[in-house]
């Protein structure tokens, strides 16, 4: 994400917060500018990515912009204004530095986000007082290996990695193995390997189960597999998953990590997925259980269909 710049007052602050916004949404910059202004008034410095420094400074007259540089590693928390995609982008910076993230949802579902735009006062107060807890979540590490055994690409996934066919005309022929033992050879459109955090994202749309984020597990979901056994598999977090694109008849595939980083994978190559040594750190400002978040985000009908039908009947007869 490049060099970070600090928004500071006349004296150097003793505390720092990183702020990341959706790259193109003006309302995200407005919300971030309001937050940064509040932080500056409390002698807390804020940092923004290079590509966001200029548009942010235009919304913050009277607050000088200067290089943060060596202070970036002192950041207490990353505050993200946007949807889950923006949070996944911010994770590329926060994960290797072990800095927790707080998401402010300006998108649609926003499962990774902790707050809404209307919660700004609560956000400011709790960041200032460090009144939050931190969850450590499983992250995946993936490596692409050539037939010769040479590693040629690696990345990480907070939500999921998806192996997908590159061309519509043919299915992928993939052998899936767990802990170096073959499990299933699928002719399919692709295969997902997901974290519990990602189980409410692509894997959910593909028919996978919802997993509570404090569960340590790996989830494998075949995509449109032409097979009698094409069920999602939940595995140990210590498992090793190998996906071998068969050299006979398959074409190249594309491996995506969180829909952001990609690599072309050729027939005869292997994708290996293991637990990443780093954990994603998510800051929580409220003790809201995941069950409540699930019901709220997906608008699950917990009142029951009969209650809704009876209410509709009363409205018609009144």
Swiss-Prot record:
One of its GO terms (cellular component) is cytoplasm. NAD(+) binds at residues 84-85, 89, 159-160, 170, 189, 200-205. The keyword DNA-binding does not apply. GO terms for biological process: NAD metabolic process; NADP biosynthetic process. SUPFAM superfamilies: NAD kinase/diacylglycerol kinase-like. Its cofactor is a divalent metal cation. InterPro entries: ATP-NAD_kinase_N, ATP-NAD_kinase_PpnK-typ_C, NAD/diacylglycerol_kinase_sf, NADK. Involved in the regulation of the intracellular balance of NAD and NADP, and is a key enzyme in the biosynthesis of NADP. Catalyzes specifically the phosphorylation on 2'-hydroxyl of the adenosine moiety of NAD to yield NADP. NCBIfam families: PRK03372.1 (NF002892). This is NAD kinase.
